[in-house]
Regions:
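Hydrophobic transmembrane alpha-helices and immediately adjacent juxtamembrane helices
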Residues: 1-284
Length: 284
């Protein structure tokens, strides 16, 4: 009888290491992450007429609404940038964060049936949600790049090309922050279902406390501007616009604060995730 030397054996035991993410195990299940990513992307546009075209239509129509409401009616400045480009780029990165947060906010409650049937590293689900959000972001950004090329040719926009090297780090930064917040919320919703109702409302409010529809440079000095700068999502949004569009306010202490906040929330998310994944199936 021949034995399969490449067969993977998974040993399941009680873990008492609060900061152990079992990343080696997650790596062994990387094919499952790819499968979850494909499934999530496919399900999003299943039984729709236009399918993934909504990734172009939705942000474009949203930007048109922003132009009418915030540009023409509220007369908010876009830092001298073309309005359509300002809103499209800002909304693309914000959508990456909000999708990572909202999709991961239902990690435990939305996958309870699957988690209860078979064992696999639970972390594969939130990671796949981030990958799905990044794919959506990439598709939307292809439209932004076409419009950006037009305005670069006309001389209306001059990107800071060297800062484009930071874009992958910005995506990891804001994707990780969204995933961490989502995991913490998901852990809490296993006992308090009311929180799931408040997530979309809270994310909407959070957007207006973030320089998405307005540039940070247009805010007057004072408490309001300081609060916006403390917002951990503000720094990556402004840094992203500075790189891609050539206009953005870089506040070093705000960047450091946001990076530190992301690290601390990440540690908290690990502890909460490891604690809840052991017993959540009995409470969901």
């Amino acid at each position: 009888m021949k034995s399969n030397a490449n067969q993977i054996h998974t040993h399941i035991s009680a873990s008492h290491k609060w900061f152990d993410l079992k990343l080696d195990e997650v790596w062994r299940y990387r094919d499952l992450i790819i499968l979850f990513t494909k499934r999530s992307f496919a399900v999003s546009y299943k039984q729709t007429i236009l399918g993934p075209l909504w990734l172009f239509i939705n942000p474009f129509l949203t930007s048109i609404v922003y132009i009418i409401l915030f540009g023409n009616i509220a007369k908010l400045s876009t830092d001298g940038l073309p309005q359509i480009l300002f809103y499209l780029a800002s909304n693309a990165l914000w959508s990456l964060f909000s999708v990572c947060l909202t999709n991961n906010a239902s990690t435990f409650t939305g996958n309870a049936g699957l988690f209860g049937k078979i064992y696999f590293p639970r972390l594969t689900v939130p990671i796949s949600n981030v990958f799905t959000a990044i794919i959506r972001f990439g598709i939307t950004m292809s439209m932004v790049l076409v419009i950006l090329a037009f305005y670069c040719i006309t001389g209306a926009v001059t990107p800071n090309w060297i800062y484009w090297l930071l874009i992958p780090f910005i995506l990891i930064w804001i994707g990780a922050l969204g995933m961490e917040c989502g995991i913490i919320i998901s852990s809490m919703t296993t006992k308090y279902r009311d929180l799931s109702v408040l997530v979309s409302f809270g994310v909407s409010l959070w957007m207006y406390a973030t320089p998405v529809v307005y540039p940070l440079s247009q805010l007057p000095e004072g408490m309001l501007k300081t609060i916006i700068e403390i917002n951990p999502v503000s720094a990556p949004i402004e840094l992203f616009r500075f790189a891609v569009l050539g206009k953005g306010t870089i506040v070093p202490w705000s960047i450091a604060l946001s990076a530190g906040f992301t690290a601390i929330v990440g540690l908290l998310a690990i502890v909460v995730f490891n604690k809840v994944e052991r017993s959540f199936i009995d409470t969901v």
